[in-house]
Amino acid sequence: MAVMCDVDSTEKCEFPALYNFGDSNSDTGGRHAAMTEFPPQNGETFFGHPSGRFSDGRVIIDFIAEDLKLRYLSAYLDSIGTSFRQGANFAFGGSTIRPPGYSPFHIAIQISQFVQFKLLV
């Protein structure tokens, strides 16, 4: 889920924070933090070190954050030493919209994590 500004709009678009839910298309390290390390190149080419992403560079939410002039989102599950001032990423590679099955972090779990997150910040 993402809200974007109309590129033809004359209104200024400002977001103090960005929150993302999804799967591998926008996972910035959630699955990596919860499960196991990925073999290289998980983001090394763009970031210069392994980043836990499902690509060798940025994922779609990184481009959205750049466009909104926000920092790249940290994975909610990779929270040690992380600042969530400009948002958090609840996406998890392999997630589904259906209840338990292939992924333990289906969309209902991501929403539950967001509710917990709101109570803490």
Name each model feature, range by range.
Residues 1-121:
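Conserved active-site regions of diverse hydrolases
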